[in-house]
Amino acid sequence: MPGKKAPNGLFAARKLERKRLKFRWSQREFKRRMLKLKEKYDPLEGAPMARGIVLEKVGVEARKPNSAVRKCVRVQLVKNGKVVTAFVPGDGGLNVISEHDEVVIVGIGGPRGRSMGDIPGVRYKVVLVNGVSLDAILKGKKQKPVR
């Protein structure tokens, strides 16, 4: 006769609890968290923000059904030298940023840390330019410092 499915009895709670814990490994998010998979593949290495140097300005074509050129920049991260593409939000945002500027990037906020909306392959966005908020520069509240 094969083994019973679950222990039953007055003192079986600990055994039941331990058995349940093993099933967590079949859940995708649990497995990713325990094996630290995000930190291993993520260019930001699990951090919420990262500093980088602008290498070039690029235009990324929007996905169907939209027709636009989304303004982005190629950024080389200071901490590990990896190169990523970051979206530049705001009207005229790309005019403010020039090559060799120091920018701070954050995740763009797509599902499961992926790209957002119609911008293919872009997972990050620019928030600071030379230590000043890009939003403040675009609104005219602050001037971009010259490095």
From Swiss-Prot:
Q: Which terms does the UniProt entry file under GO BP? A: translation
List S-S links within the chain.
none
Q: Pfam families from the xrefs? A: Ribosom_S12_S23 (PF00164)
Q: Which UniProt keywords apply?
A: Ribonucleoprotein, Ribosomal protein, RNA-binding, rRNA-binding
Give the Gene Ontology MF terms in alphabetical order. Answer: rRNA binding; structural constituent of ribosome
Query: SUPFAM superfamilies attached here?
Result: Nucleic acid-binding proteins
Assigned GO CC terms? small ribosomal subunit
Matches recorded under CDD domains: Ribosomal_S23 (cd03367)
Q: Which InterPro entries does this UniProt record tie to the protein?
A: NA-bd_OB-fold (IPR012340), Ribosomal_uS12 (IPR006032), Ribosomal_uS12_arc (IPR022863), Ribosomal_uS12_euk/arc (IPR005680)
Under PANTHER family, the record lists: 30S RIBOSOMAL PROTEIN S12 FAMILY MEMBER
Spell out the subunit comment. Part of the 30S ribosomal subunit.
What family is this protein classified in?
Belongs to the universal ribosomal protein uS12 family.
State the function annotated in the UniProt record.
With S4 and S5 plays an important role in translational accuracy. Located at the interface of the 30S and 50S subunits.
Protein name, as recorded: Small ribosomal subunit protein uS12
Organism from which the protein derives: Ignicoccus hospitalis (strain KIN4/I / DSM 18386 / JCM 14125)
Write the gene name: rps12
